[in-house]
Amino acid sequence: GDGTRVQILHALEQSEMCVCDLAALLGMTKSAISHQLKALRLANLVTFRREAQIVYYSLADEHVKEIIDMGIEHLYE
């Protein structure tokens, strides 16, 4: 759910990643990660590029990164 999407956004803040990398990092199935990425794409928070058979995801723009940073900062206040 929401917590997973936050984890995905935080991971993508570090670097562009494919579904398999995110699944391994978060200990989830590729199917579950794909489902969450679809929601993030529909919200215009992430973008993707295809390289052969692999799709790489990244944050949509610098504004998304700033929002994530503010949210994480707020959690630790």
For each feature predicted by the language model, list its residue ranges.
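Divalent metal-coordination and catalytic microenvironments
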Residues: 1, 33, 40
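N-terminal helix-turn-helix DNA-binding core of bacterial DNA-binding proteins
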Residues: 2-31, 51, 55-62
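Compositionally biased, intrinsically disordered low-complexity segments enriched
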Residues: 9, 37-38
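Residues at the C-terminal ends
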Residues: 14, 42-43
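Alpha-helical residues within the helix-turn-helix
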Residues: 24, 35, 41-42
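Short alpha-helical linear motifs
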Residues: 31-36, 75
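Conserved segment of winged-helix/HTH DNA-binding domains
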Residues: 56-77
